[in-house]
Amino acid sequence: MLKKTGIKIVIVPAAVLLVLICGTCEAYILRGPYLLDRMTRKLDGIQSMLVTQQVQFLDADENGSSQAEETLRYLFPQSFRSDARSEESQRIHVVDHGRSMTVINGKRVGGDETVFDIYKEILLFRSRERLNDRLIDSGIDMSVVAYGRFEDKIAFVIGAEKPDDPVPRLWIDKETFLPMRWLVKKKSAEADPVWVEIRYADWRRIDHAWYPMQITYLQDGEPIREIRVDSLKTNLTFPQELFDVEHLKEKYAALLPEDKAGPVSGELNEIEQSIDEFRKKYE
């Protein structure tokens, strides 16, 4: 009788301990806002940055350019400018304190950012709160975090209960707290959503901050764009007018004047066609 009772005493605490361990495993996964705080600290430490890079359009057709040279100017944490040049076209994209504008071949074509512009937002925003709001806007549930494995590295997966759940999510390296993958839904006329994945790789430390030397875009699992950094310079002084949206509006005319209606033809139509071709690479 004593032996039987002794067995029960050993088994019951073990079962209770197992329940307690399983019930508290979830608590040891760090929460989204804290992870963003750790990540932004790793990226912070400089005032400005000049980046020169090569962009490969892996999905380009035979008639279009397959690459572009691009210069980025970061004025942390609010301003950004991209100047891209291919064989046929030039594109300027500016973001300043929440306002944006795009110029293609010297003509203003609107200010909306495309999915191919957003990779820089994780690198630009140095405020946990601003980045938190931006990720929520992209569809990520910041209250949910899981563990995942990617390329033999353990990662925190913000936005998913399981790492491969078909939801927008951000992967952060568990050891370095640097972003690895950002998965978003791209706007599409198709019934099924188009998934775009942004991968950040080959991180290098420059001064007191980190920057990825390679960024790859995948659409439905297939690589469609690759960015490779040629050079980085930090803490430079940029002319403020480079980021001044109002100044740029005065400098560059709209593709079509606001008071002009009706079809376009001749030279203007050719300009519009070249703009549309270059635009497709960024939409």
What are these regions (language model features)?
Residues V245-E283:
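Gram-negative outer-membrane assembly/targeting C-terminal domains
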Residues Q56, P77, R85-E87, H97-S100, ...:
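Solvent-exposed coil/turn segments that connect beta secondary-structure elements
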Residues L2-P13:
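Bacterial N-terminal signal peptides that target proteins for export
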Residues I29-L30, E151-E246:
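Gly/Pro-enriched, hydrophobic low-complexity segments
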Residues G23-K107, D141-S143:
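N-terminal mature ectodomain segment of secretory-pathway/periplasmic proteins
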Residues N63-Q67, S79, I122-L123, E190-P193, ...:
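Subset-of-secretome marker
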Residues A27-L35, R41-G45, R99-R169, K174, ...:
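Flexible, processing/modification-adjacent segments and terminal tails
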